[in-house]
Design a protein with these regions (language model features):
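Sec-dependent, cleavable N-terminal signal peptides
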Residues: 1-14
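Intrinsically disordered, low-complexity segments enriched in proline/serine/threonine
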Residues: 8, 110, 172-174
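Short stretches within intrinsically disordered, low-complexity N-terminal or propeptide regions
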Residues: 13, 136-137, 175, 186
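Surface-exposed, well-ordered secondary-structure segments
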Residues: 14-168
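A short, hydrophobic C-terminal helix/tail in secreted or cell-surface proteins
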Residues: 169-186
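Short, charged juxtamembrane terminal tails flanking transmembrane helices
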Residues: 188-191
Length: 191
């Protein structure tokens, strides 16, 4: 289970924090944010970094020690005590995922998830031993990176991610096309 500080749905500095994948999907949909998803359960072995080109954004995952993929489970830092950095190349307005911390024996431990926005604002979320979903949605500032690091007992753990959702706000031209498509569909139904 994921414990959130601040708790579900609290808005601060135009950022909504959620601890449910369903809530994340509902809020991003209501704000017109188009989402994409990445699954890291297919990675196996060690990597200096991982660059993934998704349909709406390029995402880079890195750690100073490199990354290790555990097939069927997650992608984590190669060394305990490192910070897992997820960097977005394009203008991302929402990010959420299933995050957790594992020790050198691959056992889950508690940890802290930190989100850094492009304006320098940061938000913290506490992860329980089971990890869980954490989502952050901004309606004003772009999210450039997400850092997952361990504090306290989890300083001797490796941050991990199994899947990631992220979204962009459609451009005004994209919104206009969506509006035209909606009008065309409505006319077709009324005929």
């Amino acid at each position: 289970m994921l414990m959130m500080f601040p708790l579900v749905g609290q808005a601060q500095a135009s950022v909504v924090v959620v601890d449910s994948c369903d809530a994340y999907d509902q809020v991003t949909s209501a704000l017109g944010i188009g989402n994409d998803k990445l699954d890291f359960t297919t990675y196996n072995g060690t990597f200096a970094s991982v660059d993934v080109a998704a349909s709406i954004c390029t995402v880079e995952l890195s750690a100073s020690s490199g990354l290790e993929g555990i097939l069927g489970s997650y992608l984590k830092t190669d060394t305990v005590g490192e910070t897992l950095v997820i960097h977005f190349e394009e203008e991302v307005r929402s990010v959420g995922g299933f995050f957790f911390m594992v020790d050198k024996f691959q056992l889950p431990v508690i940890g802290i998830l930190e989100l850094e926005l492009s304006d320098g604002t940061s938000f913290l979320t506490s992860l329980t031993e089971d990890g869980g979903f954490a989502g952050f949605i901004s309606n004003t500032a772009n999210i450039e990176s997400l850092s997952l690091r361990g504090f306290g007992p989890s300083m001797f753990a490796a941050p991990a991610v199994s899947s990631l959702k992220f979204g962009v706000v459609p451009s005004p031209a994209g919104l206009a096309l969506l509006g035209i498509a909606g009008v065309a569909r409505r006319r077709r139904r009324s005929v």
